[in-house]
């Protein structure tokens, strides 16, 4: 059976955009996106638009609209974020069975790893994001947890026959040991779940004209604030300590941070590793994935994963990062 995205042709993309009143110039450029499909669409006598077509069956309409409302709330509080465009009071549209949203085109550069000045400004931006995010919970979007990101990911991988038989016992053993330790640290660490970005890697924090702005809130969910912070750090432990200090200096100008949450950095890193592999497995019926990730299923990939999980298990037994 053909995957739904195989029917999403350039003509259909143009028809969708024109169905809500825009006149295209027939130019369509596919952008780098796997979970959804994202296109730059040329518009007659105007700037191009970005059209995002949501993966069928992933989110409910309520969950998508809750993401949009969060983005609008951030924008209303002057947090620099790329918000959906609104047409006739709506931000979520449907055409030929596909749900889609339009965004203004907003380019930029990702932050430089370890740049302390940029980390201070990123901290300010994330503090503002979380100041808004902490005011109320999501109602239609799942939270980040050990079960859905960890145990459910392992179940997907074990039941899907993706791991080579030669490495299956080693992967399953270290994964179960790791999840047990992650659960222990989670239970022992006080933390508060807030609305957060959820996938806050440097590529989703773009700089243009010396100002950072937030993009792609597709994975926003409830979770601990530190989830949006740890991926900003790069390098060895000593480098990360200096970077963390700058990040926190900026962050705490706008929102309080509980330093006890720093103990969750390595558990969250472990969950992200497992969830990424499970994400690839769950999307394998989409032809774009075998084409773009041909190494998934290879002994080398899974051997590297076993090593990475073992390293995470060791990291979980080390002293967590602390603020100066």
Language-model features: locations:
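Conserved NTP-binding catalytic cores of kinases and kinase-like/nucleotidyltransferase enzymes
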Residues: 1-86, 209-211, 322-324
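Active-site acidic catalytic loop and adjacent metal/ATP-binding pocket
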Residues: 35-51, 84, 180-229
